[in-house]
Amino acid sequence: MDRFVPDRRQALRLLVGAGVGAGIVLTNSSRAFGSQPAHSGSVAAPQTPDEVLRLLMAGNERFVEKKLRHPHESEAWQNTLTKEQHPVATILGCSDSRVATEIVFDQGLGDLFVIRVAGNVVDHDVSGSVEYSVLHLHTPLVMVLGHEGCGAVTAAVQERLNGGKDVKEIQSLIDQIEPALASVDRKLSVEDQVRAGVEANVLQSTTILSALPELAKSIQAKTLKIIPAVYELQTGRVRLLKV
């Protein structure tokens, strides 16, 4: 856990505060990267964590039933996003091409702040990105979204069973997943270990994010929820996990 020291997150805040980067002009911290107070000008937008969760799960139900609405894809809507963004939720998901976040939740342009990394692991860059979305874009819900058959979790399970190491940067991902496998019974089949490992890894990332001091304050104030979930490849359904 000591890898999650705040140095990189502090650097991100300095970057935002100083306006360093391509084309960034700031008047205050809430305007970083074209942000505004969340959901301004959108009276129907959900405000609470539970409202946002209901919105996402209703969208996923439409995806499962093949009744997609494809919201917020018009040229007029796109034009409203040229100066600011008001995402309603943050999704930390895997890079897997089979899990297209906006499609899975039937959301459109500007609706979701999406962070994708193989194995949905939490390193400095990911934790900083999540903090940015919560502290500056004011998203009231963070969902950690794993998926069935995750290749990164599969690699971690296979390494635990067979030994060996992968190339340096891939190994870094595996090393971050391996602690989550401690709760997974080695006597299970490989398939069942992967299935259990996916859930354990999602819960691990949820725990790490929930322990970040600034996010913990928001959770304590009941303005933020961090929710673990798994996407089922066969059905397309997002299944919420118990914390």
PLM segments and residue spans:
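Fold-independent oxyanion-binding glycine-rich loops
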Residues: 14, 59, 94-96, 117-118, ...
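GST superfamily/GST-like fold recognition
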Residues: 220-240
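C-terminal segment of N-terminal export signals and the immediately downstream linker at the start
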Residues: 26-65, 69-73
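N-terminal short beta-loop-beta anion/metal-coordinating cradle
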Residues: 70-110
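Internal active-site segments that recognize and position negatively charged phosphoryl groups
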Residues: 211-215, 222
